[in-house]
Structure formats: C-alpha cells, structure tokens
C-alpha cells in the first residue's frame, strides 16, 4: 500500500527530529520509504506565536492498514517527545498521514485524505516535488491546487534528509 506522510518540527534541533523520524519509520516492519522531499522552512499556520517549522513529505510502501500506520506514526511522535498541550502548537515532531492508496476514510481517529492538506503549501509543495502527478481525491491535482495558494513564505532548507 502506498502512503504519503508529512513531517514537521519547530522545537529544538528541528532537522535532527525530522531525521530521527525518518530513521524510526525505516525501522518499521513491512514498511519502506520510497521518496523523501527536500526540507522547507515555513511559517506557522493557525497558532502563530511559535517558531518556524521545517517540513518535508515522504512516500512509502507498507503492508500496514491506514489505521495501523497511523498508530505507528503516533508512537514515533511520542518517542520523539511530542506533546499535545496546545492545539496546533509547537512540537518536536508532527507526522501526518496525508494519503493512503487514494482512499476515502473518516473515522474517529483518521480522515483520508487529510482534510486540510489541499490548503497547505508546506504539504503540497514538497509532495509535488517527489510526485509530479500527485492529486488529492475530490480536490484535484497538487500542481493546480498550489496555483490557488500563496506559497511565497516557503523557503528551501539547505540540508537533506537521508533514507
């Protein structure tokens, strides 16, 4: 099964948290990272009184179900010190399951595709970079969605994540 995961960090050594998340995802059984985007530095969305984020997107192949993969990602967040005290607040690591086999799902814990991905440059731009044909079900192609957004605040970060 093909999945798209967005990564973000804005506390501490942001790059190290992103790399640690990649390393932990690589340790998951029955899961293989296929592509890793460049890293982008972005301003916060929603709760604005916090540091800038580093963001990236990965695609992976997994034998887990979408719900199982989500639980694995949440455990990685916990292992890397993620706290959820402020909605959309600062975080060591954020791992969002954006798409899973182009499926539509809405449960108490998971909504696919991610309900706000289509309006977030920090998801769309790195995703498009690693999949030029990417699209969000019922929203359209990533390349078209980006045209409707102001993505000027997204800056390429000089370091690369290693798989």
Give the positions of each predicted feature:
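N-terminal beta1-alpha1 ligand-phosphate binding loop
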Residues: 1-31, 37-43
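Flexible, gly/pro- and Lys/Arg-enriched active-site loops
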Residues: 35-37, 44-53, 64-70, 75-163
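Glycine-rich and small/hydrophobic secondary-structure elements
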Residues: 61
């Amino acid at each position: 099964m093909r999945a798209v995961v967005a990564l973000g960090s804005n506390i501490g050594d942001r790059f190290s948290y992103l790399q640690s998340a990649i390393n932990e995802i690589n340790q998951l059984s029955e899961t293989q990272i296929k592509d890793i985007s460049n890293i982008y530095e972005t301003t916060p969305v929603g709760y604005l009184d916090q540091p800038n984020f580093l963001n990236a997107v990965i695609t992976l192949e997994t034998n887990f179900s979408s719900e199982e993969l989500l639980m694995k990602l949440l455990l990685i967040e916990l292992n890397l010190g993620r706290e959820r005290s402020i909605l959309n607040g600062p975080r060591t690591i954020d791992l969002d399951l954006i798409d899973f086999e182009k499926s539509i799902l809405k449960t108490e814990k998971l909504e696919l595709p991610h309900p706000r991905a289509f309006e977030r440059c920090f998801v769309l731009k790195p995703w498009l970079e690693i999949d030029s044909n990417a699209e969000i079900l019922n929203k359209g192609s990533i390349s078209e969605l980006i045209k409707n957004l102001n993505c000027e605040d997204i800056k390429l970060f000089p370091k690369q994540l290693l798989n």
